Amino acid sequence: MEIVDLKKWIRDIPDFPEKGVIFRDITPLLKNPEVFKYSVEKIAELIKEWDFDCIVSPESRGFIFATPLAYLMNKEFVPIRKPGKLPYKTYSISYELEYGQTSLEMHVDAIDKGEKVIVVDDVLATGGTTKAIKELVDRAGGKTVGVVCLAELTYLNPRENLKDLEIASLIRY
C-alpha cells in the first residue's frame, strides 16, 4: 500500500467530551480495513528495534491497536481495565485525565518480575494514562521501557511527563 496520510482518517470533534477539548475520533480509520492494517503495520515498524517482552494497553481504544500489534510481533498482551472488569486480584491506580479523573486495574500476576513492557494506546495526550500504567507495571516488578501510539497531542506536552521512556507516534498534532 502506498503512503497514507493518516490524519485524513481521524475526525476532530470539538468540545467533546467537554468544552475546550478536541476529541480525535479514530472510527473513520477503523472503518477502512486497508488503512487500519496500514496503521498497525506502521506502528510495528516504529518499534521493531525496541527490546521488550510484553504489550500492555488501556481499555478500550488502546486494545484496538495493541492486540493486532501483539499478534503481529508475537508478544504477550496484558489488558489494563477499568475498575471491576477483571475477575482476579488486581493492582489499582487512580489518576488525572485531560478532562477528569479515572482509575485503572491490572491483574497482580499479569507481568513477570523483570519483564520489559511497552504501552500501546490510540492517543497520547498528557501522558497521564501511560504514567499510571507504568506505576502498575512497577508494582508487579516489571519495567516499562516505552510507549507507542497512533496519535500524539504534542500541544499537551506528554513527553514532559514521560522523560524516562522511549516514545513513538505515527501522527503528531
Curated annotation (Swiss-Prot):
InterPro entries: Ade_phspho_trans, PRibTrfase_dom, PRTase-like, UPRTase/APRTase. Keywords: Cytoplasm, Glycosyltransferase, Purine salvage, Transferase. This is Adenine phosphoribosyltransferase. Its EC number is 2.4.2.7. The lineage of its organism: Bacteria, Thermotogati, Thermotogota, Thermotogae, Petrotogales. It comes from Petrotoga mobilis (strain DSM 10674 / SJ95). Its main location: cytoplasm. Pathway: Purine metabolism; AMP biosynthesis via salvage pathway; AMP from adenine: step 1/1. Catalyzes a salvage reaction resulting in the formation of AMP, that is energically less costly than de novo synthesis. PANTHER family: ADENINE PHOSPHORIBOSYLTRANSFERASE (PTHR32315:SF3). Homodimer. The keyword Cell division does not apply. It is found in: Cytoplasm. It comes from the Bacteria. GO terms for biological process: adenine salvage; AMP salvage; purine ribonucleoside salvage. GO terms for molecular function: adenine binding; adenine phosphoribosyltransferase activity; AMP binding.
